[in-house]
Protein backbone atom coordinates (compact mmCIF):
# COMPACT_ATOMS: atom_id res chain seq x y z
CA UNK A 1 0.00 0.00 0.00
CA UNK A 2 1.26 3.36 -0.93
CA UNK A 3 0.74 6.15 1.49
CA UNK A 4 0.23 9.68 0.02
CA UNK A 5 1.17 12.74 2.04
CA UNK A 6 -1.79 15.14 2.17
CA UNK A 7 0.46 18.22 1.89
CA UNK A 8 1.47 17.41 -1.71
CA UNK A 9 -0.77 19.14 -4.38
CA UNK A 10 -2.70 16.94 -6.73
CA UNK A 11 -3.86 17.77 -10.33
CA UNK A 12 -3.63 21.38 -11.85
CA UNK A 13 -1.84 24.31 -10.15
CA UNK A 14 -4.07 26.49 -8.07
CA UNK A 15 -5.00 30.04 -9.42
CA UNK A 16 -3.49 32.85 -7.38
CA UNK A 17 -6.19 35.28 -6.25
CA UNK A 18 -5.03 38.86 -5.44
CA UNK A 19 -5.37 39.74 -1.88
CA UNK A 20 -7.23 42.81 -0.75
CA UNK A 21 -3.96 44.54 0.05
CA UNK A 22 -2.79 44.58 -3.67
CA UNK A 23 -5.86 46.43 -5.11
CA UNK A 24 -4.83 50.00 -4.05
CA UNK A 25 -1.45 49.53 -5.75
CA UNK A 26 -3.10 48.73 -9.13
CA UNK A 27 -5.45 51.69 -8.83
CA UNK A 28 -2.57 54.04 -8.14
CA UNK A 29 -0.72 52.75 -11.20
CA UNK A 30 -3.75 53.38 -13.43
CA UNK A 31 -4.07 56.94 -12.12
CA UNK A 32 -0.40 57.59 -12.81
CA UNK A 33 -0.82 56.35 -16.41
CA UNK A 34 -3.92 58.54 -16.92
CA UNK A 35 -2.14 61.59 -15.54
CA UNK A 36 0.81 60.99 -17.83
CA UNK A 37 -1.52 60.73 -20.83
CA UNK A 38 -3.31 63.94 -19.85
CA UNK A 39 -0.01 65.71 -19.40
CA UNK A 40 1.19 64.55 -22.82
CA UNK A 41 -2.10 65.63 -24.43
CA UNK A 42 -1.89 69.01 -22.73
CA UNK A 43 1.71 69.54 -23.79
CA UNK A 44 0.91 68.48 -27.35
CA UNK A 45 -2.11 70.80 -27.52
CA UNK A 46 -0.07 73.64 -26.04
CA UNK A 47 2.66 73.04 -28.62
CA UNK A 48 0.16 73.07 -31.50
CA UNK A 49 -1.50 76.24 -30.23
CA UNK A 50 1.85 77.91 -29.73
CA UNK A 51 2.93 76.92 -33.24
CA UNK A 52 -0.36 78.18 -34.73
CA UNK A 53 -0.13 81.43 -32.80
CA UNK A 54 3.42 81.91 -33.98
CA UNK A 55 2.34 81.27 -37.58
CA UNK A 56 -0.55 83.72 -37.30
CA UNK A 57 1.64 86.34 -35.68
CA UNK A 58 4.28 85.79 -38.35
CA UNK A 59 1.63 86.11 -41.10
CA UNK A 60 0.26 89.35 -39.71
CA UNK A 61 3.75 90.65 -39.07
CA UNK A 62 4.84 90.11 -42.66
CA UNK A 63 1.42 91.22 -43.98
CA UNK A 64 1.68 94.41 -41.95
CA UNK A 65 5.21 94.88 -43.19
CA UNK A 66 4.03 94.24 -46.78
CA UNK A 67 1.25 96.82 -46.44
CA UNK A 68 3.70 99.30 -44.92
CA UNK A 69 6.11 98.80 -47.81
CA UNK A 70 3.23 99.08 -50.30
CA UNK A 71 2.15 102.37 -48.74
CA UNK A 72 5.70 103.74 -48.76
CA UNK A 73 6.11 102.91 -52.45
CA UNK A 74 2.73 104.47 -53.23
CA UNK A 75 3.66 107.69 -51.42
CA UNK A 76 7.02 107.87 -53.16
CA UNK A 77 5.44 107.24 -56.57
CA UNK A 78 2.62 109.76 -56.27
CA UNK A 79 4.94 112.48 -54.97
CA UNK A 80 7.45 112.01 -57.77
CA UNK A 81 5.02 111.45 -60.65
CA UNK A 82 2.14 113.74 -59.65
CA UNK A 83 3.88 116.78 -58.10
CA UNK A 84 1.20 119.25 -59.23
CA UNK A 85 -1.62 117.29 -57.61
CA UNK A 86 -3.11 118.78 -54.45
CA UNK A 87 -1.38 117.20 -51.38
CA UNK A 88 -4.69 116.29 -49.75
CA UNK A 89 -5.81 114.56 -52.94
CA UNK A 90 -2.52 112.67 -53.13
CA UNK A 91 -3.01 111.50 -49.55
CA UNK A 92 -6.55 110.41 -50.38
CA UNK A 93 -5.41 108.29 -53.31
CA UNK A 94 -2.71 106.62 -51.20
CA UNK A 95 -5.17 105.85 -48.41
CA UNK A 96 -7.68 104.40 -50.87
CA UNK A 97 -5.22 102.21 -52.77
CA UNK A 98 -3.80 100.88 -49.47
CA UNK A 99 -7.32 100.06 -48.30
CA UNK A 100 -8.01 98.20 -51.55
CA UNK A 101 -4.67 96.39 -51.26
CA UNK A 102 -5.71 95.15 -47.81
CA UNK A 103 -8.62 93.31 -49.42
CA UNK A 104 -6.12 91.19 -51.35
CA UNK A 105 -7.85 91.95 -54.67
CA UNK A 106 -4.96 93.84 -56.29
CA UNK A 107 -1.25 93.16 -56.71
CA UNK A 108 1.67 94.42 -54.63
CA UNK A 109 2.79 96.65 -57.52
CA UNK A 110 2.00 99.96 -55.79
CA UNK A 111 3.07 102.13 -58.72
CA UNK A 112 0.90 100.56 -61.42
CA UNK A 113 -2.07 100.02 -59.09
CA UNK A 114 -1.95 103.67 -58.04
CA UNK A 115 -1.74 104.84 -61.66
CA UNK A 116 -4.83 102.79 -62.48
CA UNK A 117 -6.74 104.22 -59.52
CA UNK A 118 -5.89 107.79 -60.55
CA UNK A 119 -7.00 107.08 -64.12
CA UNK A 120 -10.16 105.43 -62.77
CA UNK A 121 -10.94 108.55 -60.74
CA UNK A 122 -10.57 110.71 -63.87
CA UNK A 123 -12.86 108.26 -65.70
CA UNK A 124 -15.48 108.55 -62.93
CA UNK A 125 -15.38 112.34 -63.12
CA UNK A 126 -15.50 112.44 -66.93
CA UNK A 127 -18.52 110.17 -67.26
CA UNK A 128 -20.29 111.37 -64.08
CA UNK A 129 -20.30 107.90 -62.53
CA UNK A 130 -21.98 107.60 -59.12
CA UNK A 131 -21.08 105.00 -56.49
CA UNK A 132 -23.39 104.36 -53.53
CA UNK A 133 -20.69 102.87 -51.32
CA UNK A 134 -16.97 102.20 -51.03
CA UNK A 135 -17.56 98.52 -51.86
CA UNK A 136 -19.37 99.46 -55.08
CA UNK A 137 -16.57 101.85 -56.01
CA UNK A 138 -14.01 99.10 -55.43
CA UNK A 139 -16.00 96.66 -57.57
CA UNK A 140 -16.20 99.20 -60.42
CA UNK A 141 -12.49 99.91 -60.06
CA UNK A 142 -11.67 96.20 -60.34
CA UNK A 143 -13.74 95.95 -63.54
CA UNK A 144 -12.12 99.12 -64.91
CA UNK A 145 -8.74 97.66 -63.99
CA UNK A 146 -9.50 94.54 -66.05
CA UNK A 147 -10.40 96.62 -69.12
CA UNK A 148 -7.37 98.83 -68.49
CA UNK A 149 -5.15 95.75 -68.86
CA UNK A 150 -6.96 94.74 -72.08
CA UNK A 151 -6.29 98.18 -73.57
CA UNK A 152 -2.66 98.37 -72.42
CA UNK A 153 -1.79 94.86 -73.65
CA UNK A 154 -3.50 95.27 -77.05
CA UNK A 155 -0.98 94.60 -79.80
CA UNK A 156 -0.04 97.75 -81.75
CA UNK A 157 0.41 95.61 -84.86
CA UNK A 158 -3.36 94.97 -85.06
CA UNK A 159 -5.21 97.07 -87.68
CA UNK A 160 -7.50 98.50 -84.98
CA UNK A 161 -6.97 100.24 -81.66
CA UNK A 162 -8.65 100.02 -78.25
CA UNK A 163 -9.12 102.68 -75.59
CA UNK A 164 -10.93 103.27 -72.33
CA UNK A 165 -14.43 104.72 -72.62
CA UNK A 166 -17.76 104.92 -70.78
CA UNK A 167 -18.13 101.14 -70.91
CA UNK A 168 -14.85 100.51 -69.07
CA UNK A 169 -16.47 99.90 -65.68
CA UNK A 170 -19.19 97.59 -67.01
CA UNK A 171 -18.67 93.91 -66.31
CA UNK A 172 -18.99 91.44 -69.18
CA UNK A 173 -22.31 90.28 -67.71
CA UNK A 174 -23.70 93.83 -67.51
CA UNK A 175 -22.63 94.64 -71.06
CA UNK A 176 -24.13 91.39 -72.33
CA UNK A 177 -27.44 92.19 -70.60
CA UNK A 178 -27.70 95.43 -72.60
CA UNK A 179 -27.44 93.51 -75.87
CA UNK A 180 -29.75 90.48 -75.92
CA UNK A 181 -30.08 88.26 -78.98
CA UNK A 182 -31.71 89.85 -82.05
CA UNK A 183 -33.90 87.44 -83.99
CA UNK A 184 -33.63 87.88 -87.79
CA UNK A 185 -36.87 88.61 -89.71
CA UNK A 186 -38.92 85.57 -90.71
CA UNK A 187 -39.95 86.88 -94.12
CA UNK A 188 -38.03 88.82 -96.77
CA UNK A 189 -38.96 91.15 -99.61
CA UNK A 190 -39.12 89.62 -103.08
CA UNK A 191 -36.52 90.89 -105.52
CA UNK A 192 -39.29 92.03 -107.88
CA UNK A 193 -40.80 94.17 -105.14
CA UNK A 194 -37.39 95.57 -104.25
CA UNK A 195 -36.86 96.43 -107.92
CA UNK A 196 -40.01 98.56 -107.75
CA UNK A 197 -38.54 100.44 -104.78
CA UNK A 198 -35.29 100.93 -106.70
CA UNK A 199 -37.06 102.30 -109.79
CA UNK A 200 -38.93 104.80 -107.61
CA UNK A 201 -35.66 106.04 -106.16
CA UNK A 202 -34.25 106.59 -109.66
CA UNK A 203 -36.97 109.18 -110.26
CA UNK A 204 -35.85 111.30 -107.32
CA UNK A 205 -33.31 114.02 -108.31
CA UNK A 206 -32.31 114.68 -104.69
CA UNK A 207 -31.43 111.00 -104.28
CA UNK A 208 -29.48 110.89 -107.56
CA UNK A 209 -27.42 113.93 -106.61
CA UNK A 210 -26.47 112.47 -103.24
CA UNK A 211 -25.83 109.02 -104.71
CA UNK A 212 -23.11 110.55 -106.92
CA UNK A 213 -21.42 112.06 -103.86
CA UNK A 214 -21.74 108.80 -101.95
CA UNK A 215 -20.03 106.94 -104.80
CA UNK A 216 -17.45 109.68 -105.34
CA UNK A 217 -18.31 110.05 -109.02
CA UNK A 218 -19.59 112.92 -111.19
CA UNK A 219 -21.80 110.95 -113.54
CA UNK A 220 -23.88 107.76 -113.38
CA UNK A 221 -24.33 106.19 -116.81
CA UNK A 222 -26.46 103.23 -115.76
CA UNK A 223 -28.24 103.31 -112.40
CA UNK A 224 -29.04 99.60 -112.60
CA UNK A 225 -25.32 98.78 -112.38
CA UNK A 226 -24.69 100.70 -109.16
CA UNK A 227 -23.71 98.51 -106.17
CA UNK A 228 -22.75 99.26 -102.60
CA UNK A 229 -19.01 98.83 -103.16
CA UNK A 230 -17.09 102.06 -102.51
CA UNK A 231 -20.39 103.72 -101.62
CA UNK A 232 -20.31 105.86 -98.48
CA UNK A 233 -23.43 107.79 -97.52
CA UNK A 234 -21.40 109.54 -94.80
CA UNK A 235 -19.74 111.57 -97.59
CA UNK A 236 -23.09 113.31 -97.99
CA UNK A 237 -25.52 114.92 -95.55
CA UNK A 238 -27.74 111.83 -95.75
CA UNK A 239 -26.49 110.53 -92.40
CA UNK A 240 -27.88 112.28 -89.32
CA UNK A 241 -25.58 113.10 -86.36
CA UNK A 242 -24.37 110.39 -84.01
CA UNK A 243 -26.52 109.82 -80.93
CA UNK A 244 -25.88 108.01 -77.66
CA UNK A 245 -28.17 105.35 -76.23
CA UNK A 246 -26.25 105.42 -72.93
CA UNK A 247 -24.74 102.62 -70.88
CA UNK A 248 -27.87 101.50 -69.04
CA UNK A 249 -30.54 101.00 -71.74
CA UNK A 250 -30.52 98.30 -74.42
CA UNK A 251 -32.22 100.45 -77.06
CA UNK A 252 -29.97 99.94 -80.09
CA UNK A 253 -32.98 98.54 -81.97
CA UNK A 254 -34.75 101.91 -81.58
CA UNK A 255 -31.69 104.03 -82.40
CA UNK A 256 -30.78 102.13 -85.57
CA UNK A 257 -34.39 102.26 -86.81
CA UNK A 258 -34.75 105.99 -86.12
CA UNK A 259 -31.36 106.63 -87.76
CA UNK A 260 -32.54 104.85 -90.92
CA UNK A 261 -35.72 106.97 -91.12
CA UNK A 262 -33.79 110.19 -90.46
CA UNK A 263 -31.43 109.24 -93.31
CA UNK A 264 -34.36 108.37 -95.56
CA UNK A 265 -35.88 111.85 -95.23
CA UNK A 266 -32.50 113.53 -95.72
CA UNK A 267 -31.80 111.43 -98.80
CA UNK A 268 -35.19 111.64 -100.53
CA UNK A 269 -36.83 114.79 -99.12
CA UNK A 270 -33.79 116.87 -98.12
CA UNK A 271 -35.35 117.26 -94.66
CA UNK A 272 -33.22 117.08 -91.53
CA UNK A 273 -35.47 115.50 -88.93
CA UNK A 274 -34.48 114.50 -85.41
CA UNK A 275 -36.91 111.79 -84.38
CA UNK A 276 -37.75 110.17 -81.06
CA UNK A 277 -36.12 106.90 -80.04
CA UNK A 278 -37.82 107.31 -76.67
CA UNK A 279 -41.27 106.93 -78.22
CA UNK A 280 -40.28 103.53 -79.58
CA UNK A 281 -38.85 102.53 -76.18
CA UNK A 282 -42.11 103.56 -74.49
CA UNK A 283 -44.68 102.55 -77.09
CA UNK A 284 -43.48 99.63 -79.25
CA UNK A 285 -45.17 96.85 -77.30
CA UNK A 286 -43.64 94.19 -79.55
CA UNK A 287 -40.27 95.02 -78.03
CA UNK A 288 -39.06 95.20 -74.44
CA UNK A 289 -37.95 98.79 -74.08
CA UNK A 290 -34.51 99.00 -72.48
CA UNK A 291 -34.33 95.20 -72.25
CA UNK A 292 -34.00 94.84 -76.01
CA UNK A 293 -36.16 94.82 -79.11
CA UNK A 294 -36.30 94.27 -82.86
CA UNK A 295 -35.68 96.86 -85.59
CA UNK A 296 -38.37 95.30 -87.78
CA UNK A 297 -41.11 95.91 -85.19
CA UNK A 298 -39.80 99.45 -84.66
CA UNK A 299 -40.11 100.21 -88.38
CA UNK A 300 -43.54 98.57 -88.47
CA UNK A 301 -44.59 100.86 -85.62
CA UNK A 302 -43.39 103.94 -87.55
CA UNK A 303 -45.19 102.66 -90.66
CA UNK A 304 -48.53 102.23 -88.89
CA UNK A 305 -48.48 104.90 -86.15
CA UNK A 306 -45.74 107.31 -87.11
CA UNK A 307 -43.09 108.65 -84.75
CA UNK A 308 -42.77 111.95 -82.88
CA UNK A 309 -39.93 114.43 -83.03
CA UNK A 310 -37.14 114.15 -80.49
CA UNK A 311 -37.95 117.60 -79.10
CA UNK A 312 -41.45 116.45 -78.14
CA UNK A 313 -40.49 113.06 -76.68
CA UNK A 314 -36.81 113.42 -75.67
CA UNK A 315 -34.61 110.47 -74.84
CA UNK A 316 -34.23 109.51 -71.17
CA UNK A 317 -33.08 105.90 -71.44
CA UNK A 318 -35.83 104.84 -69.03
CA UNK A 319 -39.08 103.14 -70.02
CA UNK A 320 -41.96 105.53 -69.33
CA UNK A 321 -45.72 105.59 -70.07
CA UNK A 322 -46.49 105.87 -73.77
CA UNK A 323 -47.34 109.51 -74.53
CA UNK A 324 -46.49 110.23 -78.17
CA UNK A 325 -47.17 113.50 -79.91
CA UNK A 326 -50.69 113.68 -81.32
CA UNK A 327 -50.11 116.24 -84.07
CA UNK A 328 -46.56 116.00 -85.41
CA UNK A 329 -45.81 112.55 -86.77
CA UNK A 330 -43.38 111.20 -89.36
CA UNK A 331 -44.37 108.07 -91.32
CA UNK A 332 -42.80 105.65 -93.79
CA UNK A 333 -44.65 103.96 -96.64
CA UNK A 334 -43.11 100.49 -96.62
CA UNK A 335 -40.17 98.32 -95.48
CA UNK A 336 -37.64 96.37 -97.56
CA UNK A 337 -36.03 93.27 -96.02
CA UNK A 338 -33.13 91.54 -97.80
CA UNK A 339 -30.24 89.27 -96.80
CA UNK A 340 -26.81 88.10 -97.91
CA UNK A 341 -25.00 89.97 -100.67
CA UNK A 342 -28.27 91.70 -101.61
CA UNK A 343 -27.75 93.84 -98.51
CA UNK A 344 -24.65 95.47 -100.03
CA UNK A 345 -25.63 95.31 -103.69
CA UNK A 346 -29.29 96.39 -103.32
CA UNK A 347 -30.27 97.56 -99.81
CA UNK A 348 -27.31 99.88 -99.22
CA UNK A 349 -27.80 101.47 -102.66
CA UNK A 350 -31.33 102.58 -101.73
CA UNK A 351 -30.39 104.13 -98.37
CA UNK A 352 -28.42 103.56 -95.15
CA UNK A 353 -29.52 100.12 -93.95
CA UNK A 354 -30.33 98.64 -90.54
CA UNK A 355 -28.27 95.50 -89.90
CA UNK A 356 -27.45 93.29 -86.94
CA UNK A 357 -23.96 92.34 -85.73
CA UNK A 358 -22.64 89.98 -83.06
CA UNK A 359 -20.61 92.20 -80.75
CA UNK A 360 -18.20 91.11 -78.02
CA UNK A 361 -16.66 92.75 -74.96
CA UNK A 362 -13.62 93.77 -77.05
CA UNK A 363 -15.65 95.80 -79.50
CA UNK A 364 -16.96 98.01 -76.69
CA UNK A 365 -13.38 99.34 -76.28
CA UNK A 366 -12.83 99.96 -80.03
CA UNK A 367 -11.35 103.38 -80.76
CA UNK A 368 -10.35 103.27 -84.43
CA UNK A 369 -9.01 101.33 -87.39
CA UNK A 370 -10.48 98.29 -89.12
CA UNK A 371 -11.86 95.92 -86.52
CA UNK A 372 -10.68 92.36 -87.18
CA UNK A 373 -11.19 91.05 -83.65
CA UNK A 374 -13.50 88.34 -82.40
CA UNK A 375 -17.27 88.44 -82.93
CA UNK A 376 -20.01 86.89 -80.85
CA UNK A 377 -21.93 83.76 -81.71
CA UNK A 378 -25.33 85.47 -82.15
CA UNK A 379 -26.59 88.82 -83.42
CA UNK A 380 -27.06 91.13 -80.45
CA UNK A 381 -26.58 94.71 -81.65
CA UNK A 382 -28.53 96.69 -84.27
CA UNK A 383 -26.61 99.38 -86.17
CA UNK A 384 -26.86 101.41 -89.37
CA UNK A 385 -24.74 100.31 -92.33
CA UNK A 386 -23.82 103.51 -94.21
CA UNK A 387 -21.09 102.38 -96.57
CA UNK A 388 -18.32 100.13 -97.81
CA UNK A 389 -14.70 100.95 -98.55
CA UNK A 390 -11.10 99.79 -98.88
CA UNK A 391 -7.83 100.59 -97.14
CA UNK A 392 -5.51 101.39 -100.04
CA UNK A 393 -2.36 100.59 -98.05
CA UNK A 394 -3.40 97.08 -97.00
CA UNK A 395 -6.10 96.32 -99.57
CA UNK A 396 -8.44 95.34 -96.73
CA UNK A 397 -12.11 96.05 -97.42
CA UNK A 398 -14.42 97.17 -94.66
CA UNK A 399 -17.99 98.08 -93.76
CA UNK A 400 -18.74 101.60 -92.51
CA UNK A 401 -21.16 101.50 -89.60
CA UNK A 402 -22.96 104.25 -87.72
CA UNK A 403 -23.23 103.22 -84.07
CA UNK A 404 -25.33 104.61 -81.21
CA UNK A 405 -22.63 104.85 -78.53
CA UNK A 406 -21.85 108.55 -78.84
CA UNK A 407 -19.22 110.53 -80.74
CA UNK A 408 -16.54 109.69 -78.17
CA UNK A 409 -16.63 106.02 -79.16
CA UNK A 410 -14.79 104.59 -82.17
CA UNK A 411 -14.08 106.92 -85.08
CA UNK A 412 -16.30 109.83 -84.02
CA UNK A 413 -19.11 107.36 -83.40
CA UNK A 414 -18.47 105.18 -86.47
CA UNK A 415 -16.97 101.71 -86.83
CA UNK A 416 -15.00 100.24 -89.69
CA UNK A 417 -15.60 96.50 -89.64
CA UNK A 418 -13.53 94.09 -91.72
CA UNK A 419 -15.31 92.76 -94.81
CA UNK A 420 -14.45 89.10 -95.33
CA UNK A 421 -16.71 88.22 -98.30
CA UNK A 422 -17.34 84.86 -96.63
CA UNK A 423 -20.83 83.61 -95.77
CA UNK A 424 -22.83 86.25 -93.91
CA UNK A 425 -19.55 88.14 -93.46
CA UNK A 426 -17.88 89.53 -90.34
CA UNK A 427 -20.03 89.41 -87.21
CA UNK A 428 -23.01 88.22 -89.31
CA UNK A 429 -23.56 91.68 -90.77
CA UNK A 430 -25.30 90.34 -93.90
CA UNK A 431 -27.86 88.24 -92.00
CA UNK A 432 -30.52 90.85 -92.78
CA UNK A 433 -30.83 94.39 -94.09
CA UNK A 434 -33.82 96.66 -93.39
CA UNK A 435 -34.71 99.79 -95.35
CA UNK A 436 -37.63 102.13 -94.68
CA UNK A 437 -39.27 103.19 -97.96
CA UNK A 438 -40.96 106.39 -99.17
CA UNK A 439 -43.17 106.13 -102.26
CA UNK A 440 -43.55 109.80 -103.10
CA UNK A 441 -40.60 111.76 -104.43
From Swiss-Prot:
Entry keywords, A to Z: Disulfide bond, Glycoprotein, Hydrolase, Protease, Signal, Thiol protease, Zymogen
Disulfide cysteine pairs (residue numbers): 249-290
GO molecular function: cysteine-type peptidase activity
Pfam family, one: Peptidase_C1
EC number(s) stated in the UniProt entry for this protein: 3.4.22.-
Active site: 252, 381, 403
Residues with glycosylation annotation: 270, 345
SUPFAM superfamilies the UniProt entry points to: Cysteine proteinases
GO biological process: proteolysis
Family: Belongs to the peptidase C1 family.
UniProt protein name: Cysteine proteinase
Organism of provenance: Theileria annulata
Gene name in the database record: TACP
